[in-house]
Each structure stands twice: as structure tokens, then as C-alpha cells.
Amino acid sequence: MSEAHMRFADVAPASLPARRLAAGGLRRWLGRAAAALGVAALLAAPAAQAADGAELVLLGVAGGPTWYGNDAPHGISSALVVDGKAYLVDLGSGAYRQLRRAGIKPGAEQAVFLTHLHTDHIIDLASLLMYDPSARRRAKASLQIYGPGRRGALPPLAPGLAGDPVIHAENPGAGTVDLVDSVVAGMAADLNIRVRSEGVPDVRGFFQAHDIVVPAGVVKDPNVDPAPPMEPFEVWRDERVTVSAILVPHGLVYPNFAYRFDTASGSVVFSGDTALSPNLVKLARGADILVHEAIDPAWVDHIVGPKPWDARQQALARQLLEAHTTPQQAGEAATRAGVRKLVLSHLVPGDAPAEHWLHARETFKGPVVLGQDLMRIPLKQP
């Protein structure tokens, strides 16, 4: 099979029934689906949770703060499992449920890395923090949460928009520590009742939030250039993984990070939400796997509405197209970075036909994986 062919899965989604796998039904079904799209498929049985080594687990692959339908993927979230310990990147809608469906148990999570604080990347953080406190106590859990700090001054209103809307004026650009503190404060009535009447553990003892500090002197004005050229910088290191970050452009969102995870088994980079970015290319140089976002331009035309566009429509289209990457641009980033494999995730819309993402093959000649919920991909090359 040509390396340029789209691979639906290096391994199958772990949630499918074992009896179907044993009967070969999954292989036949996906093979027919691939053939119908003119795409060669590489199929393998689902892997159990890795006891050692490292694997990428796609918990959810849909992007955007919306619901695409019952059959659409869950919200964006990924896990890197290294020697049985999990490192999470973003927690979109349904991420907590997917985490457990993937076989990752309470207490296995070591750290969370939030790329940015858009709702579709953080909405299930509260579930992770609040659920299963007794299991976390038994596991002696200690979860570290890393993400963007406070933004600072808000950006100016986009051209053509009216008014001066400011939400939560006392702290309109809240950071990760603020977010976690607010979750705890908002749940205080529930938490206090459970602690005082049921003996449930105080969840505050199981996690700690950290604002990632951008190196001094890199950003002069985030409202002018929120992701200027810079070098990657380390944000986490333990005996299993080293995590580096870099700023990437996503409209005027700031700070907005991409992350690289280096392990003894290989390396994986998560683009987060980004336009085509030299910083991302620098971070991903030589990585085994690049997990990159993608947006379908045809969907943008549909969602914005018929032309001519008014000021609001123009602002929406600009945000969608200039703050994200097309499949071709994701492939270009993978080629420029010299990565071994490209995985498309944070798919916008989550329910687009698979063939819409195939354009990544035009600009990247290595293996391209169309991300699916609960897909497991080993870092080591087979």
C-alpha cells in the first residue's frame, strides 16, 4: 500500500464488540467503507490498554462548541498512555466518559495539558475534577493541570461589530488557575454537603492547577501578534515523559499552545487549534506522530450563509478560516516538520464525510490517519 493512502485506523476503535472482531466483521465492514471511498485501509485488532511502552488514545475527535448529532464523534480530547500512566490533552464534551471507556482508571491520570481555554477544549474538566473522589483517594491520585495563564487586555472589537461587550469584567481573560478555582467555587454547595454528611474526600487534595508562563520577552502585544516566532520551552518532566510547549496562532486567542511529548518509545505533537504555523513546524520537527486539527472549507461556506456576507458573517468566516487549518494545510505542516505520521483530529465539522479530509494526502506523502473516537495508535513504528 502506498504511504500516501489514508489509513482509517492503525488500530480499531476499542469499543467495538469482540465477537464482531473475531468473526472478521469489522475488517470486512471497514474494508468496504474504505473501498467505497477509494481509500486503502490498514486494519488491525483493537489493542488493550498498554501495560508498558506508549500509545496515543484519541478520546474524542470533534472540534467546536456544538452538537453534530448522535452518531458524531465526542468532543476533542486525547490521552498519551505511557507505562500505564495517562497524560491528557484537552477535555472536550464527553471526555470523562471516553476516558473510562478507554480503560483509563481514576488515578492513572498524571497531568492535563490544556491547549487553550475555548469551551470545546475544557467543558469536561469539571467532570474529571469532581467525579470518583473515593477511587482517587484509593489510588493516591495527584493530578497536575497545566494550561494558559491570564490573557491580559482584551482584543479590540472585530471590524463591523457594534458595542463593547465584556463578560466578567473583574477578570475577563481568566487563566487555568482561575478556571479550576471557579469550578471548585461553583460546586461548593455539593462538595460541602458530601464532605460533611457522607464522608466523601475533599477533592481539592487530588489536583493542582498551574498557569504556564510564556518566556519573558517573547510576546510584545498579544492583540498584534499572539504567537510570534519563538523556541519551544519545557513545561513538564517526569520519569516517563518530557512535555514542551510553543505558542501557535488561533485568531486572537492568547495564550494558545501546541504541545510535544517525548518518551522512550517515541514522540507525539498536538497542534491544538492553530492556523498554519512556523512555530508548530518547529515544535514537531522529526516527531513520530503529529496530531493536527482540520476544518472543512465547504462547511464554513455553508454555516456562514449565502454571500454577500454582512459584518457579522465576515467576522465568523474570518475566525473559522484564518484561525484553523484545512486538510491540505495540515498535510503541509506535517511535510515541513518531517513527521512520520499525520493524525487528523479536532475535525470541524465532526460529521463531515470522510472523503472531505482526504485532501491532506495532496501535501503529505506519509501515512495519514483519520482520527476516530477511541482509536489507539502505538508510538513505536510497527
Label each residue range with its predicted role:
Residues E3, R7, V11, A50-A258, ...:
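Binuclear metal-dependent hydrolase catalytic cores
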